[in-house]
A protein has these predicted regions:
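A short, proline-enriched helix->beta-strand linker immediately N-terminal to the Walker B motif
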Residues: 146-150
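Helix-to-loop junction immediately C-terminal to a conserved catalytic motif
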Residues: 49
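Short coil-to-helix segment of the ABC ATPase nucleotide-binding domain corresponding to the Q-loop/switch region
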Residues: 89-96
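Conserved ABC ATPase "signature" region
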Residues: 106-123
């Protein structure tokens, strides 16, 4: 998947959060966004994921304009700085949720494989609130990896 931002900007009220910018991400590459606090990194990633729409400009995936396309149709995984887990669901079900939504087979094996890779297999029967912050972040990462999305954004 190739993702490109073409002359995007983002305004919220009278404030400009992102100024006219273009960016192209290459397939099978790791791209790092560095910037000061409040520089717009999260806003930029939210636009890439389809969670926000730019005020101006276009978001292109493999050359196709997907600006405004709902996040569910983008096949993008995102892990937030303030991670999000489903508090009433056990860790196993948190990781399994995207697999169940897609009707995947072998959910148990896939969840256990991801949990093992991230060293959280011993927590599968616990609720997220019973884990440390770092362990909860790994649960969020495992859920994102379970999506097997061609683009993963880590905030």
């Amino acid at each position: 998947m190739q993702l490109a931002l073409d002359s995007i900007s983002k305004k919220v009220g009278a404030q400009t959060w992102l100024y006219d910018m273009s960016l192209a991400l290459q397939s099978n590459a790791v791209t790092v966004l560095l910037g000061a606090t409040q520089a717009g990194k999260t806003s930029l990633m939210r636009i890439m994921a389809g969670l926000d729409v730019p005020t101006q400009g276009r978001v292109l995936v493999d050359g196709k304009d997907v600006t405004g396309t709902p996040v569910r149709e983008r096949n993008v995984a995102m892990v937030y700085q303030q991670f999000i887990n489903y508090p009433s669901m056990k860790v196993f079900d948190n990781i399994a949720s995207p697999l169940k939504l897609r009707g995947e087979k072998n959910i148990d094996a896939r969840v256990r494989e991801l949990a093992s890779r991230l060293h959280i297999e011993m927590f599968l029967d616990r609720l997220p609130a019973e884990l440390s912050g770092g362990q909860q972040q790994r649960v969020a990462l495992a859920r994102a990896l379970a999506k097997n999305a061609p683009l993963m954004l880590l905030d």
